[in-house]
From Swiss-Prot:
One of its GO terms (molecular function) is carbon-nitrogen lyase activity. Transmembrane segments: none annotated. InterPro entries: 7-CO-7-deazaguanine_synth-like, Aldolase_TIM, rSAM. S-adenosyl-L-methionine binds at G85, S126, P127, K128. This is 7-carboxy-7-deazaguanine synthase. Pathway: Purine metabolism; 7-cyano-7-deazaguanine biosynthesis. Catalyzes the complex heterocyclic radical-mediated conversion of 6-carboxy-5,6,7,8-tetrahydropterin (CPH4) to 7-carboxy-7-deazaguanine (CDG), a step common to the biosynthetic pathways of all 7-deazapurine-containing compounds.
Amino acid sequence: MSMGPISELLTVSYPIAETFHSLQGEGAWAGGNAFFIRLGGCDVHCPWCDQKETWPTQHHPRQTVTELVQQAVTAKPSFVVITGGEPLMHDLQPLCKTLKNQGLRLHLETSGAYPLTGQFDWITLSPKPYKLPQAAIYPLANELKVIISQDEDFDWAEMEARKISPGTPLYLQAEWETEAMNEKIFAYILTHSQWRLSLQTHKYLGVR
């Protein structure tokens, strides 16, 4: 998408599953004051996904950049999280540019399955074996978060970690409905010290 005048950017719209103000529950920024923009649309189709309702793009009402930015500014968060679904199915440049113009810090949560659009202060790469990440996303990731739902996923995690820039924080997170995996992740990290545990803190707190 070519970037026209700011007035044109404001009228660009996206399918929005939800927006909400809460604490970031996962990864390096867990506990931080965050405003979430959850875009509709995903064709990665993880069988254990806890956001399957976001998959069909056409099922979600569209909101303009103006509407989304107004909500984010009103929330006064420490950072804005653009998530999904798979947000990179959409051209995020108009939204990112306008949010940045308001001085907001931007975080992205992505599987990396599509090319990166927009400028972000932090990129959480959560690769999925069902649709592999674009090679170009690996050196841009600020953290790697791998979901563990079965024993074989540990091998997948190690394979993905080898593609990430040295020193990038590495997280293992249990799929929510197989919470027993937390014990296996705990034991795994004790013998693989490069990894850290990510918990879905917001779910334990019973908040969004």
